[in-house]
A protein has these predicted regions:
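Short alpha-helical functional segments enriched in proximate histidine and acidic residues
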Residues: 10, 108, 124
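Conserved serine/cysteine hydrolase catalytic core
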Residues: 22-23, 30-95, 101
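C-terminal alpha-helix
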Residues: 120-128
Length: 129
């Protein structure tokens, strides 16, 4: 992008970003982009292919026996995210006895509903297991 302003203008209407709360979107523009010293303008701080490679090379040992967590855990998943549709929370609950909660919004729900997510996390931390 030629500037942070242009990036914001082009990214805001896209599905991934369009529901970000205003301050969260601005923080994304301020901190997820960096100046591009070679071409000018700005680019993502973490290149898209680096993110793809993280998920591509992240091995899943799900099928192996695993020890249940020794600390209290509570999973929060997005109502419209990919994990609920694939029944991942139900699998985690069955395998590890980890409760889960479905929260409104998409995959990036903490940036869509930051105040509500903070309140939920505080409530979960203060509630005895």
């Amino acid at each position: 992008w030629q500037s942070r302003e242009q990036a914001a203008e082009l990214l805001r209407p896209k599905g991934f970003y369009q529901h970000f709360e205003g301050d969260c979107f601005q923080a994304y523009i301020d901190h997820a982009l960096m100046d591009d010293p070679l071409r000018g303008g700005v680019e993502l701080t973490i290149p898209k292919m680096d993110e793809v490679n993280i998920f591509r090379t992240n091995p899943s040992l799900w099928w192996l026996p695993q020890v249940k967590p020794q600390v209290p855990v509570h999973l929060v998943v997005a109502e419209k995210g990919p994990f609920l549709a694939r029944k991942f929370p139900q699998q985690v609950q069955k395998k590890f006895d980890i409760p889960f909660e479905v929260f409104k919004g998409g995959h990036m729900f903490p940036l869509e509903h930051p105040v509500e997510v903070v309140n939920l996390v505080k409530q979960l931390i203060q509630t005895p297991a």
